[in-house]
Amino acid sequence: MLPRPKGFVINLAASPQRLDSAKAELTSAQIEPIRVDAFDGREIDLAQFAAYDDDKARRFMGRSMTQGEVGCYVSHQRAAAAFLESGDEIGFVFEDDIALQPEFKTAIPQVIEWLCGREDWHCVNLGATRLKITSPVAKVAGIEVLRAHYFPMLAHALIWNRAGANAFLAASEPIFCPADNMLRQVLTRSDMGLATAQNLVTAGR
């Protein structure tokens, strides 16, 4: 039997109710919730934040990043690092405003078991709403898993393996775009991204 998976939940200290809600969702799905202290970008001066490259951001997006975007990005760095520090082979990363769909709870144990037997992936997006340039890989517990050649946006529900989290962190600085944009760049380059055809986790509750 596989060990109970951990879900690393990105959460600001000022939002305990959101953490409680996320914990209840994950516990009901037999996932151990682990809080990751979110980075509050509102407290930083981007002009003095060494990891951020404003010139590169302007070249890439035509504008500077917002403090909130930088905060979300650093929070995803922290979550990937926390997963690696756990020593686990596979881990979930969630933002704290998630809601699990019924299919998540029924299918995810088999999805995890299926992923554990493969090395041809780095990250799975469980919450994408728009998929572009994909090819079918397998149907697991009734859920279609796709190769996301153009990794989808939204990063509120991810599954990492160790190779993927390491690859993301290695490429993650300087910061010049939102976290989901960087995920798209890293995973499209490697072609090691997967996604579920239906979003199993929604956000914004």
Task: Enumerate the predicted regions with their spans.
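An acidic/histidine-cluster motif and surrounding catalytic segment
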Residues: 1-94, 98-205
